[in-house]
Amino acid sequence: HGVEFYPAGRGIGHQIMVEEGFAWPGTLVVASDSHSNTYGAVASVGTPIVRTDAASIWATGKTWWQIPPVAKVTFTGILPPGVTGKDVIVALCGLFDKDDVLNHAIEFTGSEETMRSLPMDSRLTIANMTTEWGALSGLFPMDGVLKGWLKGKATTAAMGLADGPFKTLAARNFTHPAIEQLFVNPLTADKGAKYAKELFLDLS
């Protein structure tokens, strides 16, 4: 059936989903673990499901998701050297600690300059820990930072330098034509999109 099987010892599940290109920008990805929000770092709406829902997906190939309220989190300023994504999400959890985003989908945004100061490792950490903040998902934009990371993966894969036991998989999923096609019509919020709430954090 074309199922890729990763036995015990092959790596952390969420890391594999990102590193091997299963969590792909512009897609919805579900998994039976509360930190499936991690995939939002690569502009994939990742959200957890319970194991019975996972079983029904195996049986039917279908699932459902009740669309949650959306909270827009706007970053301003520039992340200083030595400050990490963990610092950012811990600050968000501490500053907005009254169930502000409980069961919300979060959309992270900011100016090009601001978002450029948030590298992929920081985005992965922030998206991962939106679970601790009470959110159902945490989505970062399809921007230059993501594109640069994807192109780096594609170049590494094309050169046969991908790490791990699944080199061929990385090469198949990460290609320059596929990445260029993604950014022809990138995932963006509709003009005039309305949000349940808007929060702001100065990274400086």
Task: List each model region and its residues.
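Fe-S-dependent hydro-lyases/dehydratases of central metabolism
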Residues: 1-204
